[in-house]
Amino acid sequence: CALPICAEVVVVAVTADAAPATCRYFADQLQGRVVVSMANDLVRRGTEFNAVLPPHGSIAKEMQALLWRSQVVTAFHLVPAAEFGALDEHMESDVVACGDDDAARTTLMEIIRTIPELRAFDGGSLENAVGMETFAAVLLTINIRHKVRAGLRLSGV
């Protein structure tokens, strides 16, 4: 592959404020690829996190507007970041994938299901990304106040 980005699925693991510039910089290389957004726009106030809503309603929708030739899917918002830094350790969580392209969502969920102890769920269109991005503030607040590393686990499914 002559392009610097050769993968069919690319995870953009940057902060919310870096996501737009990253998308603009790599837009041509990301054309036709599944792009995974895992950014949350949050602000910490003492022992609490609060969500910040971007103009498009979610970071994922903002990324899709910038990467209109790619298929943006949002996922991993509720998996504690420390879990990704210690991949050799037990990581148990449910991951909700939201995106407007059914095939892109399915592709990402298939990848997620290859990771032991992660379950993937179809969260519908990119409109639902705002729920995953903003719920991260609640989950982080719980983790800080209770001194835990909790993630999302859906029951009854």
Model-derived regions: residue spans:
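Short, small-residue-biased leader/transition segments that mark boundaries at the very start
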Residues: 1-3
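An anion/phosphate-binding loop that grips the pyrophosphate of nucleotide cofactors and donors
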Residues: 6-8
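Rossmann-like NAD(P)(H) cofactor-binding subdomain of soluble oxidoreductases
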Residues: 12, 16-80
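Short, glycine/charged-enriched secondary-structure capping and boundary segments
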Residues: 24-28, 49-52, 86-90, 110-112, ...
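Short, well-ordered coil/turn elements that cap or connect secondary structure elements
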Residues: 30, 67, 90, 115-117
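Short, flexible, solvent-exposed loop/turn segments with mixed acidic/basic and small polar residues
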Residues: 42, 82-89
